[in-house]
Design a protein with these regions (language model features):
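Short, glycine-/small- and polar/acidic-enriched structural segments
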Residues: 10-145, 152
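Pocket-lining segment of extracytoplasmic ligand-binding domains
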Residues: 147-259
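Secondary-structure end/capping motifs
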Residues: 227, 232-306
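Conserved C-terminal helix/tail region of periplasmic/extracytoplasmic solute-binding proteins
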Residues: 305-330
């Protein structure tokens, strides 16, 4: 029997390494893997038919569902997750130490609709500061960091408007010069890792702040998922289901290795213990059987609406409904 080809593009995150190395079987499927770098380019190639499935922004995917776009079938495969309290930056001499202190401040960002910056604003809102409580400044982070082009179908502007930096002006320079008070970005400034760097994280004890968010809300934010073209999913549902099982198996191999060795960082063993203690309901990062994953789906839909990213709130039950229908039809 001939194999069904499935062209998949995603980044080589550690838990996906077994799949990239060929250590996971995909019965009936000729899985052709592409190592993604620029996900906006990857998304364009997905929509143009260059890939059958790819890593996509969870926020932009959910925005599409909210607007009635069913061109993609999302898998409940949360391949990139993490908190974003850590992604707020200020000058090293700034008096700001908590997100609630951002009220009335000038805040810069290089992307409004990325999932990461959406979760950064969710963290800010969780602290009691609403979107319209700050003065937003949009612009390019630095000459070395490319700014993503706006996507008319999924991108929007801040409620209440925003100032735009002129061409040739950059957010990191504006922060250093005192023109803005803080920035949030997915691209961590290199100065953060220098003792004498110009910038520091706004939330100094971000692990404690993120742990508190997790305790109160019950989930770890999801950033990227896997999605397939609807035409491919409907033509080859078994191939998509085989991919889903392969992703789970890749994670299981990685997790077993991580627990056994735990040597990739000095206290990795402690991190493993924390994962087992506090995040058991979120491992593996697949499926909606987990209460934490259902809370995540509901929260992102609510947050998008309250941030003004969509005119109507998406039904969280619809985010992965198409994939669930494929699975149930087996």
């Amino acid at each position: 029997m001939s194999l069904v080809e499935l062209r998949l593009s995603m980044r080589t995150y550690d838990h996906l390494t077994p799949l990239f190395l060929g250590n996971v079987e995909t019965p009936g499927v000729n899985l052709v893997l592409d190592q993604a770098s620029d996900l906006m380019v990857t998304n364009d190639r997905l929509m143009d038919g260059g890939f059958h499935a790819a890593e996509v922004s969870f926020n932009r995917y959910a925005i599409g569902i909210a607007k009635g776009d069913d061109s993609l079938v999302g898998l409940p495969a949360f391949i990139l997750r993490n908190f974003r309290h850590r992604c707020w930056y200020v000058r090293r001499d700034s008096p700001l130490t908590e997100l609630k202190e951002l009220k009335g401040k000038r805040v810069g960002t290089d992307s409004w609709n990325d999932t990461g910056t959406m979760w950064s604003r969710a963290a800010m809102r969780d602290s009691g500061v609403d979107i319209t409580d700050v003065k937003w400044v949009l612009g390019k982070l630095s000459p070395a960091v490319a700014q993503k082009a706006a996507r008319p179908g999924t991108d929007s502007l801040p409620k209440g408007g925003a100032e735009r930096l002129a061409d040739g002006h950059y957010l990191l320079d504006a922060l250093a010069n005192g023109e803005i008070d803080a920035i949030t970005t997915a691209a961590t400034p290199e100065d953060i890792y220098k003792e004498d760097g110009r910038f520091r994280r706004l939330v100094v004890d971000y692990p404690a702040a993120e742990a508190d968010f997790h305790k109160r809300n019950g989930f770890r934010p999801g950033l990227h998922i896997i999605a397939a073209r609807k035409d491919y999913a409907e033509a080859h549902p078994e191939a998509l289901l085989a991919l889903y099982e392969a992703l789970k198996e890749s994670w299981a191999i990685w997790w077993a290795k991580t627990k056994r060795f735990a040597d990739s960082a000095p206290w990795m063993a402690k991190q493993v213990e924390i994962m087992l203690r506090d995040f058991a309901d979120e491992m593996p990062p697949y499926g909606l059987e987990s209460e934490a994953h259902r809370k995540l789906a509901a929260y992102i839909c609510k947050e998008q609406f309250e941030q003004g990213l969509v005119p109507e709130q998406a039904d969280p039950g619809l985010l992965f409904k198409a994939f669930q229908n494929l699975a149930h039809a087996r």
